[in-house]
């Protein structure tokens, strides 16, 4: 369940659906295909300035996963440095625009992400569709 506030500064209270630099898991219900549809059909279409307020703060660990999948993501490297130094009482707040740059689950067309998936899964073809990339990333993240 997510709540979108459409004020001067749009904000998304996204519970366990979207995390800073990550995506929710489907262990307690839901399906990765449905989560993909939420990301592609709803979250990615929000204005870039939309502030993100997830239910939990896993940003450092999620950025480490991003860099495992996309080691050349300079924006994620810089944000990880900031996240590791953050005051726990003043957590970083990201935006949809920043998430599109650092969140692997929004970076489904990245050549590096796709190449690394092909190394991990023999059944990922040369031009996987975004849903396949998302579902395979979610599978990797489940055991990462």
What are these regions (language model features)?
Residues 1-36, 72-73:
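His/Asp/Glu-rich metal-coordinating catalytic cores
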Residues 14-15, 52-55:
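Short, conserved beta-strand edge motifs with alternating hydrophobic and charged residues
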């Amino acid at each position: 369940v997510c709540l979108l506030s459409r004020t001067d500064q749009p904000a998304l209270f996204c519970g366990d659906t979207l995390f800073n630099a990550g995506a929710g898991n489907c262990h307690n219900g839901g399906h990765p295909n449905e989560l993909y549809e939420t990301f592609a059909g709803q979250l990615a279409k929000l204005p870039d300035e939309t502030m993100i307020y997830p239910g939990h703060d896993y940003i450092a660990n999620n950025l480490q996963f991003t860099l495992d999948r996309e080691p050349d993501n300079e924006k994620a490297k810089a944000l990880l440095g900031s996240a590791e130094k953050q005051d726990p009482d003043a957590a970083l707040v990201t935006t949809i625009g920043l998430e599109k740059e650092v969140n692997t689950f929004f970076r489904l067309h990245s050549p590096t992400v796709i190449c690394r998936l092909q190394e991990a899964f023999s059944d990922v073809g040369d031009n996987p569709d975004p849903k396949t990339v998302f579902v395979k990333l979610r599978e990797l993240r489940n055991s990462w």
